[in-house]
Amino acid sequence: MTVSGGEPLMQADFVRELFELCKKEGIHTALDTSGCVWNERAEALLGVTDLCLLDYKMTRSEDYLRYTGCDKAAVDRFLEELQKRNIDTWLRQVIVKGINDTPDSVRRLYGVAAAHTCVKKVELLKFRKLCVPKYENLGIEFPFGNIPETTDKDIRELLEGVKNKDRIN
């Protein structure tokens, strides 16, 4: 059972109860989160989480705050909690042209993964504009509207620019 968002940590009590029921039935639990929230409820939720898909959006603190409004230190703290609990983790990063689409950025992401034995996989995801209709319905301009979507070719070329690819899928 995978729970994603919005942000499931904002509903941590509900997700914990759901995961507890899953565990009683022998169902694997996966949490898809930004990791920006850490409190007692999030801590309790990790106690019944088998896998965390952690959206590690940026590798530089200033970019994290600028583009997400979240402090990268909070995400790093969440990752440390996953490490401490030995919860299998997949680091996932959406590649956005002109923002984090450089070999150096991917190398930094790989460095984060290499420093945490809980990280079993790194995924580079394509930036998509599937959310644009939601923004339009709300009358809000999509802040990344002028940025083209990332293609499979973009991801392949980016990976070719990174020497050590053994843990990057």
Predicted stretch roles:
Residues 164-169:
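Radical SAM enzyme core and accessory elements
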Residues 2-130, 136-137:
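Conserved AdoMet/S-adenosylmethionine-binding subsite of the radical SAM
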